[in-house]
């Protein structure tokens, strides 16, 4: 029985008793921190309201902030059609290729006559970069491929699907690669979709005047679904970190199985075309003979041939035949008749009186 009379102090039945026992001081007795101004004057409240109403509303308050540029995009101001003219700039940006000849065993060779690089698939080509003075800190070298012909220049140069599927790299769709540097970065412009690769510019080593970069092209020029025998140009630019172009060089590239043979063939064809053009100019400069003289000689010769040619004429009726035969015989007789001899004029002077001089044995008309 004693256990039943015991009640828990925090049970629902005893909560009201507990709440009643809680004592709290009245609000009026609570001390608050003293303010400099215990009350806001009416004038101050009015001034604040007017200032708030006069302030203009910023319409750009709720606009989204622009997204930071992604690493996949190059310079956002990249033109739709890149410039292909050479521009050395104030730093004297130049390129130089190794001389390797036209032997069949070479994997890369450059033609100065055609300004064209011939190389094998995925084989490195050494390119020497020369500058007149040091560029700004953080400068980079960028390589971009575009199509040469006007009808193809708007298209993006990519690798063919066959070579892409055989590659597991993240940048497997890029045609150009820069080998030998772990700091190479591959970009695809978000708007033009053109692909490029960059490496930081490194100053020449001690005792050298140039910096060497290694380029490799990962698809043949004849690959279906890729370049498909369309000629391409490689644009190599010197840029700042912000993408400002400091120098530009451009050269044509052909990726083939036998660079030496193709270079020799194309150089021969180019020289032949230039010689033919010079010969054509020389022929145009030589004065042509008078066309009227040629025309007259041709007309005279043709008329003579027509006169000597024999024709056959079919005639109906004996009487008509006899008549035409007489006409033909008369024409033949007239043509074969010897020309009349010219009047014989005696040699020697003629006397002033008009009388003919008598020769020995001749008599005068008066006799």
Curated annotation (Swiss-Prot):
Residues 262-306, 332-367 are annotated as: Disordered. The record marks 104 as: Interaction with DNA. GO terms for molecular function: DNA-binding transcription factor activity, RNA polymerase II-specific; metal ion binding; molecular condensate scaffold activity; promoter-specific chromatin binding; RNA polymerase II cis-regulatory region sequence-specific DNA binding. Keywords: Activator, Apoptosis, Cell cycle, Cytoplasm, DNA-binding, Metal-binding, Nucleus, Phosphoprotein, Transcription, Transcription regulation, Tumor suppressor, Zinc. Its cofactor is Zn(2+). Residues 342-363 are annotated as: Basic (repression of DNA-binding). Its main location: cytoplasm. Residues 291-302 have a biased composition (Low complexity). Zn(2+) binds at residues 160, 163, 219, 223. It holds the Pfam family P53_TAD. A motif (Nuclear export signal) lies at residues 322-333. Residues 254-261 are annotated as: Interaction with DNA. GO terms for biological process: apoptotic process; DNA damage response; positive regulation of transcription by RNA polymerase II; protein tetramerization. The N-terminal and C-terminal disordered regions undergo liquid-liquid phase separation (LLPS) following homotetramerization and activation. Post-translational modifications, such as phosphorylation or lactylation affect the ability to undergo LLPS. The nuclear export signal acts as a transcriptional repression domain. The TADI and TADII motifs (residues 17 to 25 and 48 to 56) correspond both to 9aaTAD motifs which are transactivation domains present in a large number of yeast and animal transcription factors. Binds DNA as a homotetramer. This is Cellular tumor antigen p53. The lineage of its organism: Eukaryota, Metazoa, Chordata, Craniata, Vertebrata.
């Amino acid at each position: 029985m004693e256990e039943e009379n015991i009640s828990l102090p925090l049970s629902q039945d005893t909560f009201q008793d507990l709440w009643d026992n809680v004592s709290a001081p009245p609000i009026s007795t609570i001390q608050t921190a003293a303010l400099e101004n215990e009350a806001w004057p009416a004038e101050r409240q009015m001034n604040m309201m007017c200032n708030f109403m006069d302030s203009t509303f910023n319409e750009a308050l709720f606009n989204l902030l622009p997204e930071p540029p992604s690493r996949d995009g190059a310079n956002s101001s990249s033109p739709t059609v890149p410039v292909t003219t050479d521009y050395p700039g104030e730093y004297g940006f130049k390129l130089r290729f190794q001389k390797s000849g036209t032997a069949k065993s070479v994997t890369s060779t450059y033609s100065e006559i055609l300004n064209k690089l011939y190389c094998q698939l995925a084989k490195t080509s050494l390119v020497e970069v020369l500058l007149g003075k040091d560029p700004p800190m953080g400068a980079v070298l960028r390589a971009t491929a575009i199509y040469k012909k006007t009808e193809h220049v708007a298209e993006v140069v990519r690798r063919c699907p066959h070579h892409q599927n055989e590659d597991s790299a993240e940048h497997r769709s890029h045609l150009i690669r820069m080998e030998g540097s772990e700091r190479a970065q591959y970009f695809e412009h978000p708007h033009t979709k053109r692909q490029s690769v960059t490496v930081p510019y490194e100053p020449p080593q001690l005792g050298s005047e140039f910096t060497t970069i290694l380029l490799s092209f990962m698809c043949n020029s004849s690959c279906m679904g890729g370049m498909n025998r369309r000629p391409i140009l490689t644009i190599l630019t010197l840029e700042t970190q912000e993408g400002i172009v400091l120098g530009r060089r451009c050269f044509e590239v052909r990726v083939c199985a036998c660079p030496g043979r193709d270079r020799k063939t194309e150089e021969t064809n180019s020289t032949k075309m230039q010689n033919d053009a010079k010969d054509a100019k020389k022929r145009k400069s030589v004065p042509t003979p008078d066309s009227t003289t040629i025309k007259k000689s041709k007309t005279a010769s043709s008329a003579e041939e027509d006169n000597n040619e024999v024709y056959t004429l079919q005639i109906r009726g004996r009487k008509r035949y006899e008549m035409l035969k007489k006409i033909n015989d008369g024409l033949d007789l007239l043509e074969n008749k010897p020309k009349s001899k010219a009047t014989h004029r005696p040699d020697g002077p003629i006397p002033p009186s008009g009388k003919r001089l008598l020769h020995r044995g001749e008599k005068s008309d008066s006799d």
